[in-house]
Amino acid sequence: MNEKHPGPLVVSGKLSDGERMKSESNFLRGTIAEDLNNGLTGGFSGDNFLLIRFHGMYQQDDRDIRAERAEQKLEPRHAMMLRCRLPGGIITPQQWLGIDKFAADNTLYGSIRITNRQTFQFHGILKGNVKPAHQLLNELGLDALATANDVNRNVLCTSNPVESALHQEAYEWAKKISEHLLPRTRAYAEIWLDAEKVATTDEEPILGATYLPRKFKTTVVIPPQNDVDLHANDLNFVAVADKGKLIGFNVLVGGGLSIAHGDKNTYPRKASEFGYIPLKHTLAIAEAVVTTQRDWGNRTDRKNAKTKYTLERVGVETFKAEVEKRAGVSFSAIKPYQFTGRGDRIGWVKGVDKKWHLTLFIENGRLLDYPGRSLKTGVAEIAKIHQGDFRLTANQNLIVAGVPEKDKARIEALAREHGLMDDHVTSQRENSMACVSFPTCPLAMAEAERFLPEFVTRVEGILQQHGLADEHIVLRVTGCPNGCGRALLAEVGLVGKAVGRYNLHLGGNREGTRIPRMYRENITADEILLITDQLVGRWAKERHVDEGFGDFVIRAGVIAPVIDSARDFYDVQEAM
């Protein structure tokens, strides 16, 4: 596709089966309540398998033992992954202690997984523990509503502990946007919290009776940090401040990274700039973008249903004009903004409020007690004495925020005692990330979380060998092309193709504003490391001052930049 072809506003044709499922679900109830009482299987069946996603859960099984159980004529060991709704990633120490205990007592793996969407997941909840899990969240003032499926997911907000006043304002907007776009159905409260069924008819004034065509992701971003990776998201509010006070947002729409191997009608896409709005129009614009996508998104093909494809089909200006019409608001010209990076500042920083903030590097976001490194216990011990809050970051790390000077030494001592602070962690490790993948993700094609630590060790060796031990490459591994690991915004991105094999993408940048192009297809880790060694060798010798690896491979002609991904993402580049 070399030209822009505006298409119809609404795609006609046979609706996908997901649309049938939603329309017949009675506003997301299905027969989940009845299925809960079916002790003959450890899983949810039929439509309920997908409907539980609207309630924040995915049905999974342990793929390490799937074949063994099949030989024994047993069904897979079904267990649920439950994802909390936590706009902006802020959680109190008291809430943390509650989830820490639940993970230990009621999950197969005993871990808490911080995700790159600023929340946490429990993995391995057996069917009998699912309802208690939701009830626990409710007791803690939390929920899992709308953290999966065709709704607005967990709203991200830049974790900026230094500009505390600005962060607080941005965080409040993340919460407001999340609440405004939530499903209104009482199904969640009825099924999980035993809320009384009332005779009123459910209505979904924003999402509609069949909800959105596909998942929808929203961020609130405070430049110059792009830690939330705005270009992976459908709707982005980029903070504009005046004298340290939030005055409005630049709005960017239509980002997204998921693709399908072998289907060139799918592609990653950066978000498009729509314009600037003052704060008072934020919720109206959020609602208008969502309802436009609700009505115009492709409901016949789920692989082409996301906002990014709607924008390409109808045209950015047409979509933008419809948003303005529905919101009764005109966008002003974009205000200047710039991103300089997206990594977390590991260690202590002092905020303008004179409080201290400690960012702990949590490799892969997995909190568990390992031999010699009791990470999960360490965070719980800090929670017992911490007077501020915890902030989960989009880089899967944890910030102990709002520490007064008098508590600083004690919290650092606990962090060091439990292996949560390690002065030997390299910049490379801190800038590497993977999705969960095997053994729990049903979509996994290749290892990611379990693969990353040793792979990073080998990359560290390459950097050291070329005299770049203090440097880093933004490295991401995602176990399948759905892209949860956000590899398609990395300088070096690995996308799982098959067990032990990945597509290697090069040429993103450190700021997360360029999509990397595929350099080699379906290759092994050893082959990737060989290529990395050769290219890092050139980078060490030929780089400009402060030139990142991704910028270097573009400038050196190793790979051509992706300029317009809907048209050039799959262009074959001859390797140099």
Swiss-Prot record:
Reply yes or no: does the keyword 4Fe-4S apply. yes
The record lists [4Fe-4S] cluster as bound by C435, C441, C480, C484
Could you say which cofactors this protein requires? siroheme; [4Fe-4S] cluster
Cofactor-binding details, from the entry: Binds 1 siroheme per subunit. Binds 1 [4Fe-4S] cluster per subunit.
Q: What is this protein called?
A: Sulfite reductase [NADPH] hemoprotein beta-component
Q: Where does siroheme bind?
A: C484
Q: Which gene encodes it?
A: cysI
Assigned keywords, A-Z: 4Fe-4S, Amino-acid biosynthesis, Cysteine biosynthesis, Heme, Iron, Iron-sulfur, Metal-binding, NADP, Oxidoreductase
Instruction: Report the family membership.
Output: Belongs to the nitrite and sulfite reductase 4Fe-4S domain family.
Pathway terms, separated by semicolons? Sulfur metabolism; hydrogen sulfide biosynthesis; hydrogen sulfide from sulfite (NADPH route): step 1/1
How the protein assembles, per its UniProt entry? Answer: Alpha(8)-beta(8). The alpha component is a flavoprotein, the beta component is a hemoprotein.
